[in-house]
A protein has these predicted regions:
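NAD(P)H-binding glycine-rich loop region in Rossmannoid oxidoreductase-like domains
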Residues: 38, 49-86
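Glycine-rich NAD(P)-binding loop of the Rossmann-fold in SDR/ketoreductase-type enzymes
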Residues: 52, 82-93, 138-141, 184
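Catalytic helix-loop patch of NAD(P)-dependent Rossmann-fold dehydrogenases
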Residues: 85, 122-158
Length: 245
């Protein structure tokens, strides 16, 4: 282990479980979710918690160096009523508590839905304005704005990861060129998260979370330069799906 104490929210989700299983010998984890893990947490700590209850956060963050915040409603069709407690309030409370606890960095799971309003044939480059196509994307834009605010006004380092279409190769829902161009493979997701936790000298970054796909919905040049991210997988080679738009 490298000595870092990491709070992983949404630990029972697909990305959370994948990251934990690949990194459990690398970090000391406090895992949290409203669900019960279906995997062995071993020597690590698991705490049932609803992050929209701010009274739970101080105890969760005691001794934590880095937060990897994956929890929240992940559905593009989610309503505002569902998003408000889970994606807006819980995220706000977590940032507030992180600063109060002296956490060094918060890695926020944003989404490619923040830019889904752009035409599918337009690559998203760093600095382009957000253009969400649904309220879920709006909630992730809010999280990105929190990252910028807290990085500017407090000692907290923040990295927002615009995660694309995370899918396992055996069971996936990639159906067209748009999906393939945004694919993030499990092993590339692990690498991206580890590099985000470990990176030195980064105060604030909005990074792009996709694999090394032949056609890329999101440009990876800045993410590669700042984090040293070197994705290994290509959806077009891996899945060989006939390309439709």
């Amino acid at each position: 282990m490298n000595g870092l104490n990491v709070l992983l929210t949404g630990a029972c989700g697909r990305i959370g479980k994948t990251f934990f299983e690949a990194s459990k010998e690398r970090y000391r984890f406090t895992l949290t979710d409203r669900l019960t893990p279906d995997f062995d947490v071993g020597e690590h700590r698991f705490v049932h918690a609803d992050l929209s209850d701010k009274t739970r956060l101080a105890a969760l963050l005691d001794g934590i160096d880095v937060i990897v915040h994956l929890s929240g409603i992940p559905h593009a069709s989610a309503s505002f009523d569902a998003l408000l407690p889970n994606n807006i309030l819980a995220t706000t409370y977590l940032f507030e508590a992180a600063v109060a606890a002296g956490v060094k960095r918060l890695v926020f799971a944003s989404s490619a839905q923040t830019i889904e309003g752009y035409p599918v044939d337009r690559q998203i480059t760093p600095g382009m304005p957000v253009m969400p196509a649904n309220l879920y994307g709006v909630s992730k834009c809010y999280g990105e704005a929190l990252c910028g605010y807290y990085a500017a006004k407090t000692p907290l380092s923040t990295i927002a990861l615009r995660i694309g279409a995370f899918e396992f190769t055996e069971t996936h829902e990639l159906n067209n060129a748009r999906d393939l161009s945004a694919w993030l493979s499990p092993r590339d997701a692990v690498q991206l998260l580890q590099r985000s936790v470990d990176a030195e000298g980064v105060k604030h970054l909005i990074a792009h979370g996709i694999s090394n796909n032949r056609f890329k919905r999101l440009d990876l040049s800045e993410t590669t330069r700042v984090l040293g991210y070197q994705p290994l997988d290509d959806a077009f080679e891996t899945f060989k799906i006939p390309i439709t738009y």
